[in-house]
Regions:
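Acyl-thioester-dependent acyl-group transfer interface
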Residues: 19, 23, 32-38, 44-46, ...
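Flexible, P/S/T/G-rich "lid" or insertion loops adjacent to the active sites of thioester-utilizing
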Residues: 1-52
Length: 260
């Protein structure tokens, strides 16, 4: 981050509280896992038909599923905001193995009851397009690094920083309803690749973010993995049903906690 830091941030970023997905909670030490195995070429084909990228399509289906499965098409004063990590390496020609990413939010505001999927997808895709530009990502990075360079903050005792960071984390967590991260296409070296059919990742829970997802593609299989702190699976059902309606073959498995 310091290497590519260019200028102090001109302004801070304002956030608003996002919709919280609530329900019957699992015990603290449990959370539900649901894998959806998809044929990657089919996902690419469908995304192209809608005129969006694979990531935009999956996030659009995620937003649609929350709108139909959780909100039941009812308008809400708070937006659905989905945290989306963005890999910064392609923007700076970096091959670092350290964490090098910025975070944006895919937004959908439910202001009426009759949105079509195409309208939800358009909102989500446009919110991502407006944020995932090198200029905007540089602003985010500059803001974060400028705080690190602030002499007054650097002189602050560690115990005060720890308290402040906890408060800031809780506030930032409230700005998102959940998170969807796409690790992209993963390749394994020979001869190991011959023994692996698919790969997946799971995200742990955060305060006020009770539903998250991780996406991993390997060969011709894309695995979309939900992790959830709530027992209800209405959102997941709508999600995989929509993919199936769009002509994508879906195979689903869980970690079994939904049946206990």
């Amino acid at each position: 981050y310091l290497k590519h830091y260019k200028r102090p941030a001109k302004k801070s970023y304002k956030t608003e509280k996002a919709l919280v997905i609530r329900g019957e909670m699992f015990p603290r030490e449990y959370f539900g896992i649901m894998h959806g195995y998809l044929h990657l070429p089919d996902v690419k084909r469908v995304a192209k038909q809608y005129g969006v990228t694979v990531n935009q399509y999956l996030l659009g289906v995620f937003a649609w599923s929350v709108y139909k499965g959780y909100m039941h098409s009812i308008p809400h004063r708070r937006p659905l905001a989905v945290c989306v990590p963005v890999n910064l390496r392609p923007y700076y020609g970096s091959n670092t193995t350290k964490n090098f990413f910025a975070v944006v939010s895919a937004m959908f505001r439910a202001e009426r009851e009759d949105y079509t999927f195409e309208e939800v997808l358009a909102q989500v895709a446009e919110s991502l397009k407006s944020q995932i530009t090198k200029e905007h990502l540089e602003e985010i990075m500059a803001y974060n690094v400028s705080n690190e360079k602030n002499k007054a903050l650097r002189a602050t005792p560690l115990f005060i920083k720890n308290i402040a960071m906890k408060i800031i984390y809780q506030m930032s967590a409230k700005a998102n309803s959940g998170c969807v991260t796409n690790l992209g296409l993963v390749k394994l070296a020979s001869p190991y690749d011959a023994y692996v059919e698919s790969l997946y990742a799971t995200l742990s829970m955060s305060k006020n973010q009770n539903l998250k997802a991780a996406v991993v593609s390997y060969k011709d299989t894309l695995v979309f993995t939900f992790s959830s702190a709530v027992r209800e699976v209405d959102v997941q059902k709508v999600f995989f049903r929509k993919l199936s309606e769009d002509g994508i073959d879906v195979s689903v498995e869980t970690n079994g906690v939904y049946y206990e």
